[in-house]
Amino acid sequence: MKHIEIYTDGSCLGNPGPGGYGAVLLFNQHSKELSQGFVHTTNNRMELLATIEALASLTETCKVDLTTDSQYVKNGINQWIKNWRKNGWRTSDKKPVKNVDLWKRLDEQVGRHDVKWHWVKGHSGHPMNERCDVLARDAASGKSLLPDEGFQG
């Protein structure tokens, strides 16, 4: 099984507002960068989408070390999602899970791979996190912004 390192970040100019995600995938001596901007979205949606798109870009099952600066993503996938799924995608206080469209997609992608999650403090000088931040911010301020079809706000 191939071992891939993935680094992700999301950015939003306004929250909600124009947003983007960035991801860097490393395999042996190869690297691949992914990014996309959206017209109107949130930071959390971009953090989720970065991980989804990075995992979805893998064409076979892989062992993945995924590093994010989002506690929301890391805690959601490691702690909260099992109960959300069990409770019909509702939180412990019976409210609908926010960003459920993306959580379902992430759940599906994580199921395809052996993922180990890592957290790094954002803007702390971690080279790959900083690169993802640049990709995400550049995408958010770019000209080819897409609609975020799942955004409700």
UniProtKB/Swiss-Prot annotation:
UniProtKB keywords: Cytoplasm, Endonuclease, Hydrolase, Magnesium, Metal-binding, Nuclease
Reaction catalyzed: Endonucleolytic cleavage to 5'-phosphomonoester
InterPro entries: RNase_H, RNaseH-like_sf, RNaseH_domain, RNaseH_sf, RNaseHI
Pfam families: RNase_H
Needed co-factor(s): Mg(2+)
Enzyme class, first EC level, given as a word: hydrolase
Main localization (coarse): cytoplasm
Binding residues for Mg(2+) 1: D9, E47, D69
UniProt GO cellular component terms: cytoplasm
GO molecular function per UniProt: magnesium ion binding; nucleic acid binding; RNA-DNA hybrid ribonuclease activity
GO biological process terms on file: DNA replication, removal of RNA primer
Residues annotated as domain RNase H type-1: 1-141
EC number(s) given by UniProt: 3.1.26.4
Subcellular location: Cytoplasm
PROSITE patterns documented for this protein: RNASE_H_1
Keyword Hydrolase: yes
Complexes and interactors: Monomer.
Free-text function comment from the UniProt entry: Endonuclease that specifically degrades the RNA of RNA-DNA hybrids.
PANTHER family per the UniProt record, alphabetical: RIBONUCLEASE H1
Record protein name field: Ribonuclease H
Source organism of the structure: Pseudoalteromonas atlantica (strain T6c / ATCC BAA-1087)
Recorded name of the encoding gene: rnhA
